[in-house]
Every structure is written in C-alpha cells, then in structure tokens.
C-alpha cells in the first residue's frame, strides 16, 4: 500500500477455513518480517489473519508465517531468498518520486474520430519506474460516454480513444491514473474538445458503412495484360483453375464502381494488395495448382501484387472511389507470411549489435496448439511478441495507408496476434488519420464475445460470426429466438464498437449453399429465402457486409482447392436479373436504398418486437431513432401473410410501404392490417408514417404523396421512394405565403439558394421552389444552420418543408 507506506500481510489455512474452524488459531499466528516477530489478528469478517507493517521505506522485506509454532512460507509468493540463515518469502517496496503527464495527438475530435492518448512518467529525483514495475494505466473516458477504466498498455504508454455519438460538443476532461506494483498511485488529467460532426455531401459515419467484399481476382478483369504478370503460368480459369488467378484487378474494380454505387454500397473491401508467393502449393489429391490469388500468402509487404495492377492503377481506383463518395477497405495480414518465405523475412531485421532478428517463429518460441504462439495452417508465423517485429509490420502497413489515402483496413486473423500489437497498429494509423478505422476478423466473435477487441483501443468493429447462423435459423423458422438475440445485439453495439453483419464469406460455405445442404431445402426455396435473409441483415444494427455475387444468388462451398464459394462474378446473370423486377438483385437494391435513406434509424435506432409467430413464419419489428419509426415485416413462408399489428401512430395516419409503394391506414384502435408478401416476392415490408387521412380543421384539402429531403444529401431516388425526411415540419401552401424572398431551383444546383441564405437578414423567410429535384445537398443545410431564419422548400403545390436555422 504505497499511498500509506504500509505492507499488508494476510494468512489463512484453507482446510480450517473450509471447516469453519480458522478462529481456533487465534493467538497462534504471527508473521516474522526481517527477523521481527509480529502477532497477527484474526479478522472474523474476512475469515483470515492480518498484520499491517507501517512506516515502510524502499527496500526488500523477508518474511515467513509462524502458525501454532510451525514456520510456513507464503504459498502464493514464488519469490524466496535466505535471510540470516532462514529461507523466507520476499516482497519488495518502492516509493518512487514520479510525476505523470498525459497528452493527445489531436486537441479536438468528433464522434467519428479516434485520438491517441499518451502518458509520460518522469522521475522528479532519484530512481524512476521500469515498465515492468507499472501495474496498470487507466483513463476515465466517462465524459466521452465510454469506459471509466480504459486500459493503456504500459509497454506502449499510449492508447487510441474514441467518443460516443451521443456526447454533446464541448471541452471534456480525461483523468488518468497510473498504479505501480508497490501500490503507489500517480494521477493527472488532460482535456479534449469534442466538436460537432460536420459531414460533407456524400460522406458517412463509420457505423453507416455498407460494405461490399470483393475477392479482387474474382470480380472483374479490367486489364488482361497482367493476367500472367510473373510469367509462371498461374492464370487458369479452366476446370483445374479454382485456386489459380482469374484476372480480376484494380482496373476491373474501377470499371465497376458505378455498379456498386448504384447497388447502394459505400465501402468496398478488397483482398490483400501486396506481392504474394509465386510458387505452386500443389494439391496432390486433386492434382490442382494453388496460388496466392487471394492475397493472404505475402512474399513482400513493400510491393503490390502485379496481378492486381500497378501503383498508378491502385491510386486511380482510390481516387475514383473517393470522387463517388465511396471508401476503400484493404485487407491486411500481420499474423503470417506466405509459404517458403522464412529466409527472406529473417534477413530483414538486425539489433544494435548487428545480430539478426528472426521475424518468423521457430521451435524455440512455438507453443503447440496455441492460438497466438503457433503457426496457422503451417504458414510462417511472425513473432509479434517481439517489439522489433511488430514495429516493422506496423510500419509497412501504415506506409500503404499514408501513401495512398486508404480509408479503412479489414484485419485478418486478429485471434492469432497479441492485443499489444493491435493497439500499437491502431495508434500508428490514428496518428496519420484520426478517421481511419479497422474491422477485425476474430474467428467466432459476436456481440456477446468480442474477445476484448472492441472499446479497448484496437478494433473499431469486428466481423460478426454469429450473424449468418442467426440468418439461417431465422429463415428456417426459429424467428423468435433469433429476434431475442438481435435485440441484445442491438443494445451491445454503438458507433465505437460496431459489428459487421455477414451472411457469407470467402472462408465458409455461402448461406445459400448451407440452406440447401444443411437445412435440406430446395434450390428455389433457398434462393427465395435469401431475400428475407438480406432484409434481416440490411435492417439490423451494425454494418451490412455483402459478399460479392450474393446479390445475384451466386454461392458455393468452401471446398479448397475448387473454391466454388469464390466463383468469378457472373456479369451475364446480373443483366438477366436487372430485367426481372422480382430478382434477388432488385431486392438488394431496394433494401439498400431504404437502408441508406434511413441510415440513422438502421445504424443507431432501437429495436423492438411488434408481432412474431414462429408457427406462421413472420415477424414485424420497429426500428426507431429520434422522431423516425420504421416497421419492418419479414415472412419466410411460401404464401403472403395478412397481419394486424399495433402501431404508435394515431388513427388515420397513412403508413407507406417503402418496399412496394402500397399504403395502409391506421384504424381507430391504432392497429394496421398489412400484407407481408411471400418469401419468393421478397417477404418484406418497411412501413413509415406518411400522412393523416383527415386534415386539420383549418386545412380543407387532401394530403398528397410527398417526396422528402435527406439531411446528408444522399436521398435515393429509387422506385420505392425510400427517402428520409429531415427534422423539419410539413406545412401547407397557406403557411408558405408568408415567405418574403423566393428562389427557384431549375436543376440540381443550389448555389443561388446558398447565396440567398448568406445575404439574408436576421428573421428573414426564404421560399425555394424545387422544380426538377427533391434532393437537397448537405451544404445547403450547413448554410442555414444556426441562422435565425425560416427556409421553405416547396416540393409540390400541396406540400412543402420549413427548415428553421435555429432548430
């Protein structure tokens, strides 16, 4: 107890304690410290003997217990030494004269940022503390809405922090506490300014990411000149080519960005980009050549894989994606290298004396079967517990991010690397770009088991390995139990600790394949149920992660080396599905349009059950955030389902189905009768309140269908009208007549609107006539924000929106 210059000694005989007879030793127990006998007192409340040695100073203390005349060493202290000819247990006490300071890499942050909190210990005089003498460093992040005891690794002396999106702007204090192994406590604090998040047009938050995972080599061949880039014959799209290169590349991704944008995704996850081994890892059983087309068998972390393209093509992909408001997520590996690369990687590092540092694990530092200290699939395993090795791996991956302005990383094999490495990696990336995020692949992770990788300064999200099981169970009839789990999951997720919801991946049988081969249903039924599974995924909290080809009903088995779950994307099939209004492709496109239009509801909203029946194969849930509530219905049966559900809206309110455009009116008892289509027809409804059937007494007119604007400038003009309203008030032409300044928007340029707003005086009213568009860009709202004025956007002769700058 360093704070009180005290050492507390305790003794208990477990056998006597189990017999409730420890008190029989009262008066017979003492501790001998540095030769001095000290009687111990029985503590009935804790059923143990204790003695406090006070007034201690820095030094070593040798002790043993005497129990009923017999000496005993401390059974829980392995350190022992001789003192005056007597074997003793040993403890150490140190009172360091230290000061502690804390600082941040950024003085200000918003809820989408990360920030590196650094701690520095300085000896005022005399001896300081070694890293091994620091027991714990914690930061109180409660003013940022997070953990009161955020742990910082003493070997790093810094950790990456974040902020909940519910925290109000303003200056926040972060107290920091350092405890040493001697019980001394050192405290300090630092401040950070939380600012309002300002999103430019087309920007989105981390928890609003809609991710599309493309195995780059299998997506689209945009440059045939790199198909046999190394001249070793590793390009083969034939029957035996399941584990060879197929030609997909950066140029192909670039050419298909418009397809992905139109589909509704905003983030593209691509497989690792670095150079991979060129040697054939032949499978003799099937006589099949296998190569590193997937990117996970790195041979050089400083070069691009030539099969994927040049540095210019990679930069062009990133630039083009960014110009379209999309982000690129690159898959990275820090756990292992490709087969046969031991000699190369062991030749890279040397210590201060010029001695080689082995980057690859050998028999001397392998623990057989251990997740972290053994190799995965016999791949060369990096010795990441060695700081020099970690530093090199972190440097390589940070340089790629910095050089090309990569937006996000998907981190492979998180389970197989120490948390200290991931913390160091996150710190390095955050210092370059506070907005940079990582989603980790921790095999088996889910909302109830994040393995300590969320909210701890390492990963910003984890891939949810539970979700495809949830989806499989849901569409095969176990609806209520899955809903139970999804509501718990909903409560566990926030913008700093996100889960990526995937149905299929490159490492597993696809969900559609499992429905046929595990759940034993027909191909046609599996295809239909994938629509319902997609609705479950897209409307759930967390980041939807689409696996390429899933949106056109493509799937297969994780059957190496054939890898039918990694087929080339079928662009011919896509064109067929575009022409079929009831195709799974059009289902995905519709649902993603709804997701993007109501992104705050789906990314952050509450989830509640409205109605559910396992026997009848349906459920209706509500997703609500702020003033918006959506009702999502799903039906896994082959026939449509008529359902009466209670709603929060008042009688007469018209609910519109964003999925097919149909409307339903709330009854006097605040119920609504809806039809959920059969699974083959999408099995989906998404209801939102549109209008009331009876106007207010002073408004003798019929409400008409209206379009709405979206505050982030990303309203979707889909056939389903999946557009989200801002927190504005719907008005009538009678109210609009008070406007004193009028601006007309002919096309989609709002420059004259912004100019009028900037020139307007306090208390002004402006009317904007929208002739050909109902999409209002974010910078228009930014120009209005904070100003004392009303701006009315007239969307039709019957309805308008009033935006108050102070609201």
Predicted feature residues:
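Aromatic sugar-binding surface patches on proteins
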Residues: 45-52, 153-161
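Long, contiguous ectodomains of secretory-pathway proteins
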Residues: 214, 734-807
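Surface-exposed, short loops/turns at beta-strand junctions within beta-sandwich domains
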Residues: 55-59, 163-171
């Amino acid at each position: 107890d360093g704070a009180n210059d005290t050492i507390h000694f305790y003794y208990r005989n477990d056998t006597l304690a189990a017999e409730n007879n420890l008190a029989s030793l009262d008066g017979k127990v003492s501790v001998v410290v540095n030769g001095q006998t000290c009687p111990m007192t029985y503590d009935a409340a804790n059923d143990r003997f204790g003695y406090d040695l006070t007034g201690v100073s820095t030094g070593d203390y040798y002790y043993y217990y005497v129990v009923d005349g017999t000496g005993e060493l401390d059974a829980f202290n392995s350190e022992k030494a001789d003192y005056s000819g007597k074997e003793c247990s040993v403890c150490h006490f140190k009172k360091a004269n230290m000061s502690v300071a804390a600082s941040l890499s950024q003085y200000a942050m918003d809820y989408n940022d990360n920030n590196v909190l650094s701690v520095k210990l300085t000896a005022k005089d005399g001896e300081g503390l070694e890293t091994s003498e620091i027991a714990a460093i914690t930061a109180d992040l409660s003013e940022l809405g997070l953990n009161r005891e955020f742990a910082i690794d003493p070997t790093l002396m810094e950790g990456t922090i974040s902020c909940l999106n519910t925290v109000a702007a303003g200056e926040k204090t972060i107290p920091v506490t350092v405890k040493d192994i001697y019980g001394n406590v050192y405290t300090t604090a630092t401040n950070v300014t939380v600012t309002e998040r300002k999103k430019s047009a087309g920007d989105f938050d981390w928890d609003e990411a809609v991710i599309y995972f493309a195995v780059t080599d299998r997506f689209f061949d945009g440059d045939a000149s790199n198909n046999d880039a190394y001249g070793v014959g590793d390009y083969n799209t034939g029957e035996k080519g399941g584990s060879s290169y197929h030609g997909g590349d950066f140029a192909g991704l670039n050419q298909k960005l418009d397809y992905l944008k139109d589909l509704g995704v905003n983030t593209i996850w691509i497989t690792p980009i670095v150079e991979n081994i060129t040697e054939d890892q032949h499978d003799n059983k099937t006589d099949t050549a296998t190569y590193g087309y997937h990117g996970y068998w790195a041979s050089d972390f400083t070069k691009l894989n030539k099969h994927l393209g040049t540095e210019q093509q990679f930069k062009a992909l990133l630039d083009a994606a960014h110009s379209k408001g999309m982000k690129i997520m690159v898959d990275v590996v820090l756990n292992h290298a490709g087969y046969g690369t031991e000699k190369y990687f062991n030749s890279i590092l040397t210590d201060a004396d010029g001695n080689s540092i082995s980057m690859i694990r050998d028999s001397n530092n392998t623990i057989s079967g251990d997740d972290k200290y053994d190799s995965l699939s016999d791949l060369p395993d990096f010795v990441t517990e060695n700081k020099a090795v970690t530093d090199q791996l972190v440097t390589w991956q940070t340089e790629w991010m910095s050089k090309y302005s990569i937006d996000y990383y998907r981190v492979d094999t998180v389970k197989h690397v120490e948390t200290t490495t991931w913390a160091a990696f996150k710190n390095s990336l955050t210092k370059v770009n506070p907005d940079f995020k990582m989603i980790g692949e921790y095999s088996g992770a889910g909302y109830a088991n994040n393995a300590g990788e969320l909210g701890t300064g390492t990963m910003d999200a984890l891939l949810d390995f539970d979700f495809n099981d949830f989806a499989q169970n849901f569409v095969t009839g176990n609806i209520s139990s899955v809903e139970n789990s999804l509501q718990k999951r909903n409560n566990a997720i926030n913008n700093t600790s996100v889960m990526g919801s995937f149905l299929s991946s490159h490492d597993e049988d696809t969900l559609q394949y499992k429905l046929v081969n595990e759940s034993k249903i027909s191909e046609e039924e599996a295809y239909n149920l994938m629509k319902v599974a997609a609705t479950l995924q897209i409307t759930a909290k967390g980041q939807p992660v689409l696996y390429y080809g899933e949106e056109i009903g493509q799937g297969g088995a994780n059957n190496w080396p054939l890898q039918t779950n990694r087929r080339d994307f079928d662009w011919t099939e896509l064109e067929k599905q575009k022409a079929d209004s009831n195709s799974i492709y059009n289902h995905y496109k519709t649902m993603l349009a709804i997701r993007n239009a109501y992104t705050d509801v789906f990314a952050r909203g509450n989830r509640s059950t409205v109605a559910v029946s396992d026997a009848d194969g349906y459920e209706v849930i509500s997703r609500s955030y702020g003033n918006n509530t959506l009702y999502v219905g799903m039906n896994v049966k082959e026939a449509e389902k008529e359902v009466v559900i209670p709603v929060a809206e008042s009688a007469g309110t018209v609910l519109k189905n964003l999925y097919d455009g149909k409307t339903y009116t709330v009854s006097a008892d605040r119920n609504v009768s809806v039809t959920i289509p059969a699974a083959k027809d999408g099995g989906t409804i998404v209801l939102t309140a549109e209008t009331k059937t009876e106007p207010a007494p002073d408004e003798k007119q019929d409400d008409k269908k209206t379009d709405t604007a979206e505050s982030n400038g990303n309203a979707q003009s889909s056939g389903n009208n999946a557009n989200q309203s801002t927190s504005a008030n719907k008005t009538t032409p009678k109210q609009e007549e008070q406007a004193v300044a009028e601006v007309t928007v002919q096309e989609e340029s709002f420059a004259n609107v912004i100019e009028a707003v900037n020139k307007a005086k306090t208390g002004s009213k402006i009317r904007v006539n929208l002739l050909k568009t109902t999409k209002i860009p974010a910078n228009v709202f930014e120009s209005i924000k904070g100003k004392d004025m009303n701006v009315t956007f007239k969307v039709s002769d019957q309805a308008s929106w009033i935006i108050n700058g102070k609201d």
